[in-house]
Amino acid sequence: MKYIGLFTALTLFFSVNSFAQKTEEIKVWGNCGMCKKTIEAAAIKAGAKTANWNKDSKVLNVEFKEKKTDMQKIQQAIANAGYDTQDIAATAEAYGNLAECCQYPRKGAEKK
């Protein structure tokens, strides 16, 4: 009987934790494999659990816990790394620090 209670408690614990995850997509401009590594690393450093950027579609899929971070922080970290997102543009200085192969035609968000 105590095993049923323990099993129920563990099931409830893990199901509640899984609901705390949020998955979002954002547009991030970039060009190459080096961009992919930098963009994904910036998102992870900002608290994303997973980050996967598609260089063809320019879409970053991120999974994160809302208690740990939010999309604003993730996008700001990516912009600080030199990449424009759909809502936050990188500064001219951050963009200028990108390798030549990573400098894309800037069509992203307006500077905020």
Question: Model regions: which residues?
Answer:
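Bacterial Sec-dependent N-terminal signal peptides
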Residues: 1-23
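Short amphipathic alpha-helices in soluble, non-transmembrane regions
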Residues: 39-41, 73-81
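Conserved short beta-strand edge segments in small beta-sheet-based binding/regulatory domains
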Residues: 82-94
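Immediate flanking context of iron-sulfur cluster ligation sites
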Residues: 22-28, 95-96
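Short, low-order "capping/linker" segments at domain edges
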Residues: 96-112
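Charged, low-complexity intrinsically disordered tails and linkers
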Residues: 3, 26-31
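Axial heme c-ligation environment in periplasmic c-type cytochrome domains
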Residues: 60-63, 91, 95
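N-terminal targeting signals for Sec/Tat export/insertion, comprising classic cleavable signal peptides
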Residues: 29-63, 67-68
